Amino acid sequence: MTEVVAREVYYCGVCSFPPEYCEFGVSLKRCKDWLQDNNQELFDKIYSDDALATQTSTLSIERQEKISQELAKKQLKEEAKQERELQKKLASKVLIKRIERNRRKHIISISGLEVFNIDMKKLAKTFASKFATGASVTKTADKKEEILVQGDVSDEAKEYIEKLLEEQGLNGVEVEQVDEKKKKKATAPGATPAA
């Protein structure tokens, strides 16, 4: 019996399609640039003048122009959308609150991560195993998710979140630490505070 060899498929680093199908996506220009930088041989095979001429020889000139105009319009829309999303991400900030529970016990609350398409449950699980503490995802009063981590690990959490955002190419995002102390109960006039 003969051995069946799996076919090697090369995928685009921008749209994750095979390069032959990048033209059906909305980021063709970026896909072409990426392919030219990473695999010149395949780029020449797909986008050389001869290859383009054979592909378009069956289409009428009007149809070709219409297709290229529609494609250019879609690409511009997609680029504008991606630019808006990037600006929104860079303008937002992550807030790490250190909240005092008892005298020496603290929890930290991490909010503002939902903008960055980060799986909150997975991140909470990572924090729980990385810091050997309890961590959970809860909803705030304004229906946004936050991660609650037991223990005073705000500095370590800040470093980890900054590294995580840097991996996504978001170096300009502000990660702010806030110390929130529990309000002490007011004592009645004339009463002595408990020690």
UniProtKB/Swiss-Prot annotation:
Q: Indicate where this protein is primarily found.
A: cytoplasm
Supply the CDD domains for this chain.
DENR_C (cd11607)
GO BP of this protein: formation of translation preinitiation complex; translation reinitiation
Enumerate the UniProt keywords alphabetically: Cytoplasm, Ribonucleoprotein, Ribosomal protein
**Pfam entry (one):** DENR_N
The cellular location(s) given in this protein's UniProt record come to:
Cytoplasm
Q: Where does the source fall among the domains of life?
A: Eukaryota
SUPFAM superfamilies listed in its UniProt record: eIF1-like (SSF55159)
| Subunit structure as annotated in this protein's UniProt entry | Interacts with the 40S ribosomal subunit.
Its name, as the record gives it, is: Translation machinery-associated protein 22
The organism encoding this protein is Scheffersomyces stipitis (strain ATCC 58785 / CBS 6054 / NBRC 10063 / NRRL Y-11545)
